Amino acid sequence: MSKSYDWSFNSAQKPNSKLMLWLYNQYVLDCPVKGVSARSCDFSTLGWSGHSYLTLASAMKSESNLANQTWRYVKDAELNSTLRELGVFNKYTLDKELCVYAKGDKQKVEGLFYMIRNALAHGSFRYHCTKTGEYLVMQTSRNGKLRGRAVIKIDTLKRWRSLLNNRRKYLK
């Protein structure tokens, strides 16, 4: 059985300073969600809008180990039950990547980038380095209410940022 961890971020391990700087630059300062960062180019400026969001979501899924079951964008009222259904409400493992977050006023891909940005900006993350890779575990909340949780490989986060800037490769 795989080791399980609590969703606790007090005194959680952080990545080395080089990786932390990259994460901060790519997902906080350069967050592509419109209106979130004055420094970034939003999705539409990068060429991702309309139907191309579906292509982006598909490309992101192919650049990760996420499946429909483990990349869930759910109503607020369904968040806790979805986390329970996946067996990650109280604890998580590093067996698979997962992203479960509440729908807000953003599309699925925007919501994911917004969740990652918020977890990094507010310190609700934990870094793991194992034989199978490096992982970033994240959680977001608003007014004390859980809004999302994710376990994502660092390599996946790097590939996602790369594909954002290479839309011509995916939109033919």
Where are these regions (language model features)?
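Amphipathic alpha-helical interface elements
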Residues: M1-G133, M138-K172
